[in-house]
Design a protein with these regions (language model features):
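Conserved N-terminal beta1-alpha1 strand-loop-helix module at the mouth
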Residues: 1-81, 101, 160-161, 188-208
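Structural preference for beta-strand elements that scaffold enzyme active sites
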Residues: 10-12, 37-39, 61-65, 84-85, ...
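Glycine-rich beta-to-alpha transition loops that act as phosphate-gripper elements at the mouths
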Residues: 16-17, 66-72, 88-91, 108-113, ...
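Catalytic cores of alpha/beta
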Residues: 71-81, 114-122, 139, 158-174
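Glycine-rich phosphate-binding active-site loops on the catalytic face of alpha/beta enzymes
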Residues: 85-95, 129-137, 171-190
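Histidine/lysine/aspartate-rich catalytic loop segments that bind and position anionic ligands
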Residues: 89-134
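Short, charged, surface-exposed secondary-structure boundary motifs
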Residues: 95-99, 117-122, 137-142, 162-165, ...
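Hydrophobic secondary-structure block in the mid-to-C-terminal portion of proteins
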Residues: 145-207
Length: 209
């Protein structure tokens, strides 16, 4: 992962619960609607194989990482499959240490000021504030007061409508997941709806620059 490139379009799509035969059409709809960065969560059945297939299908058009990484086992399986960055819902010390030692971008989750600070000084590329929707954009403004140098990734509850507010309040980047990659759309292979939802985020970001 090139972090500087990620910051040019600072949006991360979270894919959870997808099936192997959906990977290729998902990659195509993601690429065609302008999203550049995705994660596939490790608590999805067959996650390493899904990551490997996504990397192959993307042919360099996407930056692909692994999410919900909670152990060294998860981490190594993800990296072997081709993941280039790591995301966790919490700070996992041995995962952090491995990523830092091997210069792998890592986004640990945190919520309270103490957790956010600890994750940052532990070497986080960005700190994933999760679940962001519990406090909203104003929380980011308050956190950035004393911690103005900490880079924050807003996760959970970010919509096309409030995305720019999160960024204005201090989020360096945002995520979206179940609201775009909806279970019913995935089940029915309604990839057009997914593409339209992605496009709303990308277009709103471009308009707000």
């Amino acid at each position: 992962m090139n972090v500087a490139d990620f910051k040019k379009l600072p949006m991360l799509g979270i894919l959870r619960g997808i099936e192997l035969d959906s990977v290729e059409p998902l990659v195509e709809v993601i690429c065609s609607n302008g999203l550049k960065t995705i994660e596939i969560t490790m608590n999805t059945y067959g996650a390493p194989e899904l990551i490997k297939k996504a990397v192959s299908a993307a042919k360099g058009r996407l930056t692909i990482g692994a999410g919900t990484v909670l152990s060294i086992k998860d981490l190594k399986e993800a990296l072997s499959a081709g993941a280039t960055f790591i995301v966790s819902p919490v700070l996992v010390d041995d995962v952090m240490k491995y990523c830092l030692k091997n210069k792998i971008p890592v986004f640990p989750g945190a919520l309270t000021p103490s957790e956010i600070y600890k994750a940052w000084v532990s070497g986080a590329t960005m700190v994933k504030v999760f679940p962001a929707k519990c406090f909203g954009p104003e929380y980011f403004k308050e956190i950035k007061g004393p911690f103005n140098d900490i880079e924050l990734l807003a996760c959970a509850g970010v919509t096309p409508e409030n995305m720019l507010e999160y960024m204005a309040c201090g989020a360096t980047a945002v995520t979206f997941g179940a609201s775009v990659f909806r279970k019913e759309w995935l089940k029915n292979k309604e990839f057009g709806f997914i593409g339209s939802s992605i496009a709303k985020y990308v277009q709103n970001f471009e308009r707000g620059k």
